[in-house]
Amino acid sequence: MMGENSSAYTTLADNQLYNQFSPSRRKADLIASTSATSSPNLRKSPNRGFSSPRAQQKPITIFDQIVSWFHSEIDVRKKLASFVCGAAVALSFIVTVSILKLSIWAPFSSVQDSLTWWLYPTSWPVTLFIWLSSVAWTFLIIHQFCTVTQVPRIPITDTYAWAGAALEFVHRLIFVYTAFTVSESSFFEDFAWIAIAFSVAISSALVIFRSDFHLNFSNVQVNSFKTLIDFAKSLPYGSLAETSGVDAAIAYTAAMALTVFGSPLLWGFSAWWLLINIQFHLVLFGVCFAQQFFAKIFMKIVNQIVMKPMKFPFPPPYTVHSPTPDQIRTLPNVIETDDPLLKMFALHDLRTVAWEDEKRRVDVFSLSQPGKHPRNWKAVSMPCTRMLDELCSRMTVSAARLVGYSWDDHDVENEEVPRDALMMPRKMREMTYRGAGQSRQQKTIAPIRSNNTQTVGFLAKITRNLGLGKTERLVISRFDAQQNAYAAEAVYMLVVDSMGEDRFGVVQKDLKDLITLLCKLIAAIDTYERAKASVADKSDVTYLRLVDASLKSCLQRVVTTFGSHLRSLELADEHIRTIKLVCAEEI
């Protein structure tokens, strides 16, 4: 595993351990400490604290160096995404002005003007201004909201989200104002501009609070002009247009309500003439629809540029005493970092190795020299199995809490969660434990939910959808679900590949433990699903089911590959039953 290079992997704890087992080093430190405390100049006084640069500075580990390098790379990608999105906004500005210049009263001259206006040098400064302002806007939005741990919808109580909505409103208002000025539109007059500005404000809030700013890997990676065309073809234009139309209709309805009810007070009854102005309706809805549609395309572009997969090499089989920065950024080191985005890149790369990269799988199944230890396999498999084991523990605790089992009074070493209590409906469970004595009831029944989600009223549902209500606590978030799915698909696909590629048997030694962990996790998720159904809980389990589907697919592949060879592992009866239920075949 990593850590065989003492010069590169030394931290503060390693120094202390080295001092403990090194007599010469301990003696030198003892002499230095004695002289420091006996010197009058360095003696600590009650009014002055003793400090030294060595004591104040936190040691920089290789993980800090890797994270620092990764953040610099991501910052470059975010800047590139900002420039590309700014160019897309400038292009949409040209299209918007061209459409606004069209007129049914002068069809030929207006068509010629709409197609050639942007070719004149006098129009270039305006387009450049739109591009630069859009670059600044997209850069701030990407840095503030686009994260790998972002929730599907930002809560409406988030103050930073409101600041982002205000920034979006100012940016879009400048866009519309400049487009109307260049096209010499007549909508600056009367109440039309107020209605359009109000619709832009509503649409800007919808862009921030109803858009998903989650960073995720794209299915099609753009590496050439052909892949760019494939990426453009892969975009779900139908669903994007549908969701954009719904959000644009909300902003359009709000602007029309202001025109009907607010215009007599603000402008007079003459503003009602806008209600029969077809061009006004088309422009109003078109402005909102264009804003919503670009917000959807915006995240596609950001994910394509920022979330471009990275390849991390494996360390060589021999020990490198003075590794270069490139030799430090190995996959075993990267996968151990605490940065969420970097870990997601590492797990995605490990999954790519397991599924597609046969050349790099040779490094996974290789042995270190000297010693012949499966260093790479242990380094990449242990973080994944540790992650899956933590998920198994969380699912067990969550299932116990759903049925009212107090985990605080549970002896982990001598007891197990009563399975009959997990499968029993709530009313029958309460009747059973009510007559079993006060002590048993206190030990077993300790519900954590005071309200039933079936009794949620209509108003509470509306506030929850708007983000005002109390959000339901998920057992597993989208980020955790994606991480666990990548970890499972990577490790267990490597197990499948080891059947024909593992020449040294580095995976076969851990095969029983890996299959046992997989069966335990599938059973824990099934137990939670049954407990959730027994208490009529309405919490969202979409992400949990994605993990469950990945786990069952992994188990199916492992059983299909090894078949009858699994009998020699002597698995427990409960794990054999899980395999029969999931794979529907005997082993």
UniProtKB/Swiss-Prot annotation:
Keywords: Membrane, mRNA transport, Nuclear pore complex, Nucleus, Protein transport, Translocation, Transmembrane, Transmembrane helix, Transport
Disulfide linkage: none
Annotated TM spans: 80-100, 122-142, 162-182, 188-208, 256-276, 282-302
Example of a GO MF term: protein-macromolecule adaptor activity
Pfam families xrefs: Ndc1_Nup
Subcellular location: Nucleus, Nuclear pore complex; Nucleus membrane
Region (Disordered): 32-55
Membrane topology field: Multi-pass membrane protein
A single BP term in Gene Ontology: protein transport
GO cellular component terms, A-Z: nuclear membrane; nuclear pore transmembrane ring
Main location per the UniProt record: nucleus
Membrane-side (Perinuclear space) residue stretches: 101-121, 183-187, 277-281
Residues in the Cytoplasmic compartment per record: 1-79, 143-161, 209-255, 303-587
Domain of life: Eukaryota
Protein family per UniProt: Belongs to the NDC1 family.
Reported function: Component of the nuclear pore complex (NPC), which plays a key role in de novo assembly and insertion of NPC in the nuclear envelope.
Protein name: Nucleoporin ndc-1
Species of provenance: Caenorhabditis briggsae
Native organism taxonomy: Eukaryota, Metazoa, Ecdysozoa, Nematoda, Chromadorea
